[in-house]
């Protein structure tokens, strides 16, 4: 039978509810075991693989081998560094029951743990609070090694697509604004200027009887040329 060493300090919130305090270490004959509901195949000798944002459920089974009744009143825990055993973060205390367990009997309850830590290797050490012999006692459970990683984001994730659309719209707006302020003026200033050809027109006073009509592609006035020069000579073909 496994005997656990009890920690001396009790949580203030739980002590207030029950009305007892502990001053020194105690020894009790209580067996506590748990398994991970989502991955029951993971044992204490394995390394669990967790992702930030997931919720892990621990199902506890407690066997009371004491001669008196014990009452489970809460559960907490901590993530520690498996190499240095330093505490990295504490879990939020959760109320249980109170769940009374008579001598020689067992009981079960569950604890939900939200995973939100810096990606790394950890050891999860749950702790169960219970009342025994008019004292609040804490039993640290076995540790569970775990590797925590960030959740991978898919390229087709709606949140990522929305962010991409917002960025594209922002870049398009900035580009359009820059064109209106600087680009448009720059293009107008550097574009080649097309020169239009003009034809000189000679003005003639009205009433002079002079016509300035030109013909075809000759480009000269035919009114002053004698008619004889304008007629084409006809030649007869002699047989």
Curated annotation (Swiss-Prot):
Intracellular or extracellular location(s): Endoplasmic reticulum membrane
Segments traversing the membrane: 161-181
Pfam hit, one: TRAP_alpha
Principal localisation: endoplasmic reticulum
Keywords linked to the UniProt accession: Endoplasmic reticulum, Membrane, Signal, Transmembrane, Transmembrane helix
InterPro entries found in the cross-reference section: TRAP_alpha
Keyword Kinase appears in the UniProt entry: no
One annotated Gene Ontology cellular component of this protein: endoplasmic reticulum membrane
Segments on the Cytoplasmic face: 182-239
Membrane topology category: Single-pass type I membrane protein
Signal peptide: 1-19
Segments on the Lumenal side according to the record's topology features: 20-160
Function, in words: Is probably involved in a pathway contributing to genomic integrity.
Family: Belongs to the IRC22 family.
Protein name: Increased recombination centers protein 22
Organism phylogeny: Eukaryota, Fungi, Dikarya, Ascomycota, Saccharomycotina
